Regions:
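Active-site anion-handling motifs in enzyme catalytic cores
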Residues: 1-242
Length: 242
């Protein structure tokens, strides 16, 4: 039997992304560490339960999510999915979206340079999708494997409308105050508090006039992260300020 890693400190923080869902090892780890007396906190975790395996379709309808029992193993769980029913049942859960909202790049004022920009998941490139409108290739494109964060943000901000199959592309575009159209190839897309227009890739041009903006999104996201930070600091007895 493999030995499970035991952190050297009693407070463990799990950060980021779709760690809750199929084929995720999170529940195994949280249960063991809970039995060993660790305090566990989840920051910006989220659903990743259902996936569309058809790379041509890249669309999954809104599906009821069943969260695993391991979410009760956390002393505090900040989850990026905005499901009020979950928070009403599991009291240790609060809405905490990705902490990348704190980055100073979102405080810069960017000029809109083009009507549309595309931001694609590197494992789901749009050039493999049949039936995409010809107009798709008339606009700037960037992949989510770009390592320069500021370049990514400048690219997203340069468009009036962002078309993407990247979860974070949709999230960051919303924080920038842009209109967003996203292709929900995974159930995680349906958990956004500030929802983009969700459609099949072939339908993006039909939806071009549909998106709205959420001017409150950046401040709501930052406030949620700051409040969660102080909750954790209070729990672990560290009074260090931001």
């Amino acid at each position: 039997m493999k030995t499970v890693y035991e952190p050297p400190h009693k407070n463990v923080i799990y950060g980021g992304g779709g760690l809750i869902g199929q084929m995720r090892p999170l529940s195994y780890m949280t249960q063991i560490l809970k039995r060993k007396g660790y305090n566990q906190y989840g920051w910006g975790l989220g659903d990743h339960s259902y996936i569309c395996l058809n790379e041509q379709l890249q669309y999954i309808p809104n599906t009821p999510i069943q969260y695993p029992a391991c979410i009760r193993d956390f002393d505090l769980l900040g989850i990026r999915d905005d499901y009020k029913e979950l928070r009403s049942v599991v009291k240790n859960v609060s809405w905490v979206p990705c902490a990348s909202c704190m980055h100073k790049a979102f405080d810069v004022q960017y000029n809109i340079e083009t009507e549309v920009v595309f931001f694609s998941h590197s494992t789901l490139p749009l050039n493999i999708v049949h039936g995409m409108p010809q107009e798709t290739w008339n606009y700037p494109h960037l992949m989510n494997d770009e390592s320069d964060f500021n370049k990514v943000i400048r690219h997203l901000a340069s468009g009036e409308v962002i078309v993407t199959n990247s979860y974070h592309g949709a999230y960051w575009g919303t924080l920038l105050g842009r209109k967003v159209i996203a292709f929900p190839w995974c159930s995680k897309f349906w958990g956004f508090r500030h929802k983009p227009v969700l459609c099949k890739p072939q339908e993006w041009l039909q939806q071009i006039k549909t998106p709205t903006t959420y001017p409150e999104a950046k401040e709501e996201s930052r406030e949620a992260n700051i409040n969660f930070y102080y909750k954790i600091i209070e729990r672990i007895g560290n009074d260090k300020k931001l």
